[in-house]
Amino acid sequence: MKVLVIADPMASFKTYKDTTYVMMREMAKRGWQLFHTLSGELSVQQGLVTAQAAPFEFLGAKSDDDHEWFKAADKVQTTLKDFDAVIMRTDPPFDMQYLYATQFLTLAEQQGAKVFNSGQAMRDFNEKLAILNFSQFTAPTLVTTRSADVRAFLKEHGDIIIKPLDGMGGMGIFRLTEKDPNIGSILETLMQLDSRTIMAQRYIPEIVHGDKRILIIGGEVVPYALARIPQNGETRGNLAAGGRGVAQELSERDREIAETLAPELKRRGILLAGLDVIGRNLTEVNVTSPTGFQEIMKQKNFDVAAMFADAVEAWSKQ
């Protein structure tokens, strides 16, 4: 297979934990021809979606800080429909440049390209707002641009989490209680004087046991979750915010949530999704560049990367 991976610069990968790295390793092991490009190197020329893509050889990292784990050749201008699969792995934020990239990908799909996840799905499934489609699994939630609404929501629930709709890695997430002396300044900063839409959710105390990432690949649920456990005194479990990742078997509730969402995600062309679950509550649906492969693979000896490559191969033939 000939595969294009759209991702951040490969030299920036933290190979000891990066999910895209093990995806590439598995695909290289299968003898697939690999190319890399940046989302900013997509363009439309004479009506066709093209990319400045570099073919590369996967060498493998010799240490955690080895940034020479690949050998790239000169970039070539290639149309996306000439690949067997195009895998979008660019990290958020989902800004205007990201939006344009998804529109290019949708056009490429119309021209015959097989894109995972689909451009349309990434536009439709904002990682925070997507949970509103599955309210039976969520804690009380508010989405608003008005700080007065947030204050009323805080008064109702007493202890809440607020977060931007376009963040990642726990950035911009605050916990508020009624006695917090900084409520005003936090809301002004995050909501930019009622000009920025945010999400508020009732605080879920089970966060101390971990914010679980549940992976769904090709409509199938990975049998292990990655519980991201916050540091002492921290409310964010994100690994980027210092959380500790512990792989564990899915609970009955985890499986209920995942198996309910899996068919809908598959229907929408989402080959890979990462559900975030705290306690019994769904908090996010990640579809841009879900992570957690390496921790599950190392701790549970379950080959998530192979499951992903199998799904890419199967879906690319549909």
Name each region found by the language model:
Residues 1-4:
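Extreme N-terminal starter segment of soluble prokaryotic enzymes
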Residues 6-7, 13-16, 233, 249-318:
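ATP-dependent carboxylate activation and anion-phosphoryl transfer catalytic cores
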Residues 9, 91-93, 165-167, 290:
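Short glycine-rich anion-binding loops that position phosphate/pyrophosphate groups of nucleotides
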Residues 11-29, 35-143:
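Conserved N-proximal alpha/beta basic substrate-recognition cap immediately N-terminal to
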Residues 19-20, 147-148, 155-159, 169-257, ...:
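Phosphate-binding site of ATP-dependent enzymes
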Residues 28, 109, 154-155, 266:
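Anion (oxyanion) recognition and catalysis
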Residues 119-123, 228-230, 278-281:
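Short glycine-enriched loops at secondary-structure junctions
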